[in-house]
């Protein structure tokens, strides 16, 4: 049997199904303005060895099924000789490390990008006291804090992936920022990953708005009657 007739090492039917799930969700995020100029990348676990991921350089608001490709967990293209995102390793490292993780979303909204620049020197953004912290899996109260790591940007994905792995060795997180770049968020399925992504977006926007208010006037606590 030659290479042209060799069976695919993954389910084509499952890929077809996941491609439509990815495209529908990515289009919504693109229409929200979170994927400008063909940026951002998105993936979904296909099986125990493969992931479906967006092809590099495609307009995320106009994706079709051919814009979703397959990679193995080393980030190598499988099935079709297409070029995956340069950041594919940041997706596949999560699938290798956490068998329960099935979806990884990476976006470039203005809020995410500005927050990543503003807090770059702090290495982390601490979100505390918000009711919406309960949107993150495992949180059941607002009386807690969630830390969002901020990594320095680099074009060397091996270096960045190693930094992310070192962080995950020490703590559990549902996402992180890359300086001047954007946000990564993930979950056990698309719905959970979207919830985490949207919660990060909302909470980061709240933090930015608070900074603006504190810069223009002193916030005076209202006494309880």
Swiss-Prot record:
SMART domains: Aldolase_II (SM01007). The keyword Repeat does not apply. SUPFAM superfamilies: AraD/HMP-PK domain-like (SSF53639). The gene is mtnB. NCBIfam families: PRK09220.1, salvage_mtnB. Binds 1 zinc ion per subunit. One of its GO terms (molecular function) is methylthioribulose 1-phosphate dehydratase activity. Pfam families: Aldolase_II (PF00596). GO terms for biological process: L-methionine salvage from methylthioadenosine; monosaccharide metabolic process. Belongs to the aldolase class II family. MtnB subfamily. This is Methylthioribulose-1-phosphate dehydratase. It catalyses: 5-(methylsulfanyl)-D-ribulose 1-phosphate = 5-methylsulfanyl-2,3-dioxopentyl phosphate + H2O. Signal peptide: none annotated.
């Amino acid at each position: 049997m030659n290479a042209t007739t060799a069976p695919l090492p993954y389910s084509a039917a499952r890929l077809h199904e996941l491609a439509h799930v990815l495209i529908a969700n990515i289009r919504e995020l693109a229409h929200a303005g979170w994927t400008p100029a063909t940026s951002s990348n998105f993936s979904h676990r296909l099986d125990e060895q493969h992931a479906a991921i967006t092809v590099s350089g495609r307009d995320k608001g106009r994706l079709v099924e051919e814009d979703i490709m397959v990679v193995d967990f080393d980030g190598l293209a499988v099935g079709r000789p297409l070029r995956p995102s340069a950041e594919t390793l940041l997706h596949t490292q999560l699938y290798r490390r956490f068998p329960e993780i099935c979806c990884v979303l990476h976006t470039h909204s203005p809020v995410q990008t500005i927050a990543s620049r503003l807090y770059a020197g702090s290495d982390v953004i601490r979100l505390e006291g918000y009711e919406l912290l309960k949107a993150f899996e495992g949180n059941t109260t607002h009386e807690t804090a969630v830390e969002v790591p901020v990594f320095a940007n680099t074009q060397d994905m091996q270096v960045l992936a190693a930094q992310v792995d070192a962080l995950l060795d020490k703590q559990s997180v549902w996402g992180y920022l890359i300086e001047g770049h954007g946000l990564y968020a993930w979950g056990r399925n698309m719905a959970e990953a979207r919830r985490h992504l949207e919660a990060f977006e909302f909470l980061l926007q709240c933090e930015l708005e608070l900074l603006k208010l504190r810069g223009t006037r002193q916030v005076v606590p209202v006494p309880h009657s």
